[in-house]
Amino acid sequence: MGQKGFLVRSPVILSVDPELTIMGYAKKEGQSNRIVISEWALDSEMLGGLILHELAHIYFTEWGAHSHDGELLEEVLRGLKEREGLRAKETEFLIDAFNHLQNILVDDIVFAVMNEKELETTKQFFAEWVSDRPSGDPVLDAALLTRNAFATASLKRRKLFEPNSEMCFRNKEFVSALGQHAEGEYDWLEGFLENSKPDLNRKQFLASIGEYFERILALMRSSARLDDLR
């Protein structure tokens, strides 16, 4: 990363957690940062990409990116709670949506330093994220729709998306099953993530996140259901 101009200034400690169920995460510890890796991830082909990904999160935090400002996220969620009365599950999935935005931004660094083999592995990784059948629960389906948009936008942003791939057909099946309104919202979500920029000022970033969250929340509160799931 440093050779590409993305220098992490603080010391970084790597550790393994045998009880961790996710692949890994990064956290601040005083003047240092720690990347915690699950034991099972040590054998994964994605290990190198995972470490790069977590280092990129640390870089964005050191840089002071609004996407990695926890207080800003709390401000947006607090405003939504006051206006809309968010439920716990809605809040959880909106935080997931914010994580998708964080990830697509930091992955600009990751994709820039990956080799060809790592890129192919990552394409398959994102393909496995795509859901093809809605659950019938609008809250969960809005979260799945956003995750599909993130996976597709991640590849389109780096010119790696294949329009005739199984991933593409699975996503189309999912979106069309939710109906015409969801198709329009999906297009907006995918475009928002594909074209998101890390250098917006605070006011611009707050406005963009506000619209992003409000659109997802509207989908969560939609009464639409699949006919065969009613």
Enumerate the language-model features and the residues they cover.
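Pan-zinc metallopeptidase signature
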Residues: 118-230
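Catalytic glutamate of the conserved HExxH
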Residues: 50, 54-58, 62
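Short pre-active-site segment immediately N-terminal to the catalytic Zn-binding motif
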Residues: 35-51
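Short helix/loop segments within enzyme catalytic domains
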Residues: 92-94, 101, 105-133
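Glycine-rich, often proline-containing surface loops adjacent to acidic residues and nearby aromatics
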Residues: 31-35, 84-86
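Short, solvent-exposed secondary-structure capping/transition elements
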Residues: 46, 61-70, 109-122
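Post-HEXXH active-site segment of zinc metalloproteases
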Residues: 45, 60-95
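Auxiliary, metal-adjacent structural segments of Zn-dependent hydrolase domains
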Residues: 1-30, 42-44, 92-94, 217, ...
